[in-house]
UniProtKB/Swiss-Prot annotation:
Domain of life: Eukaryota
Comment on pH dependence: Optimum pH is 7.0-9.5.
Keywords: Acyltransferase, Transferase
Family matches, as SUPFAM superfamilies: Acyl-CoA N-acyltransferases (Nat)
Name of the protein in question: Histidine N-acetyltransferase
Molecular functions per Gene Ontology: L-histidine N-acetyltransferase activity
Tissue expression as described in the entry: Expressed exclusively in the brain and lens.
Functional note: Enzyme responsible for the N-acetyl-histidine (NAH) synthesis, which is a major constituent of brain and lens of ectothermic vertebrates.
Gene3D superfamilies, alphabetized: 3.40.630.30
Stored CDD domains: NAT_SF
Organism: Oreochromis niloticus
Length: 337
């Protein structure tokens, strides 16, 4: 059910009603004002410009704005997933001049009240973070799983030259097998995805806590979630259909506001075998940089113990620039009371 933009307010706790903020559902007309207060967010890797319109059209999602004196100062998106039991929080941003004043907490509480009033079956709030969790966070949240974050940048043209040195060029699967001793990975169609992820338990030990994390979004293994994922432009891959050890999802590249001709490539890697993870990583790079021209920020999420060796491979063998040291992507949740 889509909440209309008039937004019938839930009965708010007194602390929220006294916060001096006005809340509304975002519309297309708000886009420019939202982006004006979002400068430099997420290190220039903001996905909102490419997803804003589709978010507004998503029947399971509501994008909420907080205003102060009529000006947009914060945004948060909430999406109901997991068969209606989970409120997924995404896209949170607060205007620079309002940060550190508790605005994010007020907006999150408002969204929780709104979702509970509209979807009483929702039980938990889930979100994905990459900052350092402190003692207060552990009092509030349960950690569902974590992945290491490997962020790198390169020029697409330079990377293609390095890949060609290994015989990896163009969209050619057969060349990949000449560089890796294992058989080439299997790219899955929708039927194979359903079979592996929903109709068998073959991937339960590969996925962290039986959770699919796709571009910061954590999903339980449920048909309703798979329906959401299969609408997206994603390459799904495993090393072996009959006995998978490593699985990966690569979100198709999209432009980001870090600068002209900059793209973002997101790769979610699951499994503990370094050689197989590296093989699938190379395949995704080969496939998705073949037609790109310009700069690419590539972010790969992988099992934390694999991070160091994969980072060394990226730097020493592929000659890409590592943007930052080891950080973690943490999926956390709390009960909606």
């Amino acid at each position: 059910m889509k909440i209309d933009t008039s937004l019938n307010m839930p009965q708010l706790p007194e602390a929220l009603s006294q916060a001096g903020l006005q809340f509304s559902v975002a519309t297309e007309e708000d886009f420019d004002e939202i982006m004006a207060m979002s400068q430099d967010i997420y290190g220039g890797l903001d996905y909102l410009p490419t997803r804003y319109t589709s978010w507004l059209q998503d029947t399971n999602r509501t994008v909420i704005l907080a205003r102060k004196h009529g000006k947009v100062i914060a945004l948060e998106s909430v999406c109901v997933i997991d068969d209606g039991e989970t409120m997924l929080v995404e896209g949170l941003r607060v205007a620079p001049q309002e940060r550190g004043k508790g605005v994010a907490g007020v907006l999150l509480r408002f969204c929780a009240e709104l979702v509970k009033s509209r979807y009483p079956e929702v039980k938990v709030c889930r979100l994905t973070r990459d900052d350092q969790l402190g003692p207060k966070d552990f009092e509030k949240y349960r950690i569902i799983t974590k992945q290491g974050i490997l962020l790198m940048r390169f020029r697409a043209e330079d990377l293609k030259l390095h890949l060609s040195e290994f015989g990896l060029e163009g969209d050619n699967e057969s060349t990949l097998s000449t560089f890796c001793s294992s058989p080439p990975p299997v790219r899955l169609d929708h039927t194979a995805i359903q079979q592996l992820y929903l109709n068998s338990d073959l991937l339960h030990g590969v996925l962290p806590n039986a959770t699919i994390i796709q571009d910061w979004q954590p999903f339980k293994l449920l048909p309703s979630n798979m329906a959401i994922l299969l609408k997206k432009e994603i390459d799904w891959m495993v090393d072996d259909m009959s006995n998978p050890t490593v699985a990966s999802l690569c979100t198709f590249p999209f432009r980001v506001p870090i600068g002209d001709d900059w793209y973002y490539l997101n790769i979610d890697m699951f499994g503990k075998d370094l050689a197989l993870a590296r093989q699938q990583f190379l395949y995704h790079l080969q496939r998705h940089t073949a037609t790109l021209k310009g700069h690419v920020m590539c972010q790969m999420f992988l099992d934390p113990p694999l991070w160091k060796a994969m980072a060394e491979f990226c730097h020493n063998t592929l000659s890409v620039e590592l943007v930052k040291e080891y950080t973690e992507q943490c999926v956390v949740e709390c009960d909606l009371i």
